[in-house]
Each structure stands twice: as structure tokens, then as C-alpha cells.
């Protein structure tokens, strides 16, 4: 049970993505249209060479902001092979359409794995 799921239908889930193309964002997770999601764990692992990694939260729910509004979760972190960054102990709340993206750079053949655990709380329609 989380802050937002008390007394509501909710489900915990884990997601994974591999970012393997330089300077191209890979979407780790997108919050569904009928949910609010609480991210309780985020793990970023470098599996190949020396790579710079950006992890961003793409905010889809701010109509007055530019369409490319994003917030940096991990900004230009230089990671050598085997390095990882683990975020726990805090909660990031995503609204419908929000996403978490991972973008590797500075390495011709990057391999960055991203894993997250979220609790999706269903938003009643109507």
C-alpha cells in the first residue's frame, strides 16, 4: 500500500529497458491513461564501456508548458562498465502520460539497463 493507493485498486509492477543506441532515448516506463503511478525504485546499470547517462522525467500533464518539458533525475552521469545508480527511499509520483526515459551518450555501442518498480493506482472514470 502506498500514499495514493489506500483504499483504492492498485497493482505493483516492475519494468525493464535496455538503452543500446547512442543519443537515443529509451522509455523505461509510461504511466497509463487510467492510473497514477508511484515509482519506489529506480536502478540504472552500465553494461558496456564508459558511457554518459541521462535519466529524465517527461511531464505530459502540464498543458501550459512546452511539449518537451522534462526534469532531470540523473543528469550527464559518467558511468564506467559495471557502475550502477540505485534510487530508493523516495517516491516519484507520475500522472497519466508521464514517462521515464534513459539516454546514453559518449559511447558508440552503449548498453544501459534501467529497471523500476511502480505501484499503479487506478483512477475512477467519471
Predicted regions and their residues:
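Short, surface-exposed beta-strand/strand-loop-strand elements in extracellular ectodomains
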Residues: 48-75
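Short beta-strand/loop motifs in extracellular/secreted proteins, especially
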Residues: 40, 51-55, 110-114
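Beta-strand repeat scaffolds of extracellular/surface proteins
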Residues: 47, 90, 105-107
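Beta-sandwich interaction modules
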Residues: 81-97
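Solvent-exposed, conformationally flexible loop/turn segments
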Residues: 19-24, 74-84
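A short beta-strand element within beta-rich, extracytoplasmic domains
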Residues: 37-46, 99-102
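C-terminal interaction-tip segments
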Residues: 1-36, 59, 96, 104-126
Amino acid at each position: 500500500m502506498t500514499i495514493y493507493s489506500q483504499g483504492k485498486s492498485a497493482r505493483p509492477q516492475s519494468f525493464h529497458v535496455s538503452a543500446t543506441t547512442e543519443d537515443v532515448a529509451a522509455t523505461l516506463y509510461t504511466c497509463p491513461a487510467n492510473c497514477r503511478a508511484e515509482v519506489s525504485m529506480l536502478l540504472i546499470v552500465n553494461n558496456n564501456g564508459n558511457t554518459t547517462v541521462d535519466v529524465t522525467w517527461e511531464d505530459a500533464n502540464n498543458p501550459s508548458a512546452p511539449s518537451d518539458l522534462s526534469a532531470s533525475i540523473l543528469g550527464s552521469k559518467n558511468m564506467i562498465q559495471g557502475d550502477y545508480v540505485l534510487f530508493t527511499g523516495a517516491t516519484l509520483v507520475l500522472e497519466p502520460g508521464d514517462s521515464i526515459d534513459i539516454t546514453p551518450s559518449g559511447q558508440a555501442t552503449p548498453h544501459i539497463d534501467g529497471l523500476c518498480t511502480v505501484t499503479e493506482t487506478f483512477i475512477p472514470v467519471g
